[in-house]
Amino acid sequence: MLQNIRIVLVETSHTGNMGSVARAMKTMGLTNLWLVNPLVKPDSQAIALAAGASDVIGNAQIVDTLDDALAGCSLVVGTSARSRTLPWPMLDPRECGLKSVAEAVNTPVALVFGRERVGLTNDELQKCHYHVAIAANPEYSSLNLAMAVQVIAYEVRMAWLATQENDETAEHEETPYPLVDDLERFYGHLEQTLLSTGFIREGHPGQVMNKLRRLFTRARPESQELNILRGILASIEQQNKGK
């Protein structure tokens, strides 16, 4: 089940950080590392700092875009240390661990970490169902990438161990949630429908689509509910064609 949890690093710029992250992951039983458009490729320094977790580096999936890394996932959590223009559903690391383990019973989960200096962009954070923030010392809150991964990975492991000690499988939802791919298709369909009705203007959607993403992220529709919404959009399009 832990194999279903992806640690996703976006545009990492130092190979040593890749190795340190691999070590942090493996100590907590996580091995599924994804590298999104890394600015450098894993090298001997990454292997050296992995300190016995070189297999995690060797098996890492290297992809061009964040969408590639999120494909097939039903839950995405992005790390964020900064306040944003649009508030987003937040988790603390413990809640993140519990949700990740519960969801990973059935489908892949992505825990996304940003660039060493600037983290994740607003656009990248809007692809996440939740944001997670580590409550570090406000007078000195500087966690490096591997430290942040270690904190989250520890909480994932604690949540997983709790299910083992109770001789139970992780609690999971009976009703399936749509994968990230399905949600992105829905958002594309929604934007196209709003354009065709004149609700938003071509090239100038303003904050409407961002706020709608936040609304549906907060509501987190089930797969059947998303299908209903897609059906409504299709019906609107059909009516427009008949005019």
From Swiss-Prot:
Binding site for S-adenosyl-L-methionine: T79, S80, A81, G114, I134, S141, S142, L143
Gene Ontology terms: biological process: tRNA nucleoside ribose methylation
Claim: tRNA processing is one of the keywords in the record: yes
Keywords: Cytoplasm, Methyltransferase, S-adenosyl-L-methionine, Transferase, tRNA processing
GO molecular function: RNA binding; tRNA (cytidine(32)/uridine(32)-2'-O)-methyltransferase activity
GO cellular component labels: cytosol
Pfam families per UniProt: SpoU_methylase
EC number: 2.1.1.200
Compartment list: Cytoplasm
Intrachain S-S bonds: none
Family: Belongs to the class IV-like SAM-binding methyltransferase superfamily. RNA methyltransferase TrmH family.
Function as written in the Swiss-Prot or TrEMBL entry: Catalyzes the formation of 2'O-methylated cytidine (Cm32) or 2'O-methylated uridine (Um32) at position 32 in tRNA.
Subunit (UniProt): Homodimer.
Protein name: tRNA (cytidine/uridine-2'-O-)-methyltransferase TrmJ
Lineage summary: Bacteria, Pseudomonadati, Pseudomonadota, Gammaproteobacteria, Enterobacterales
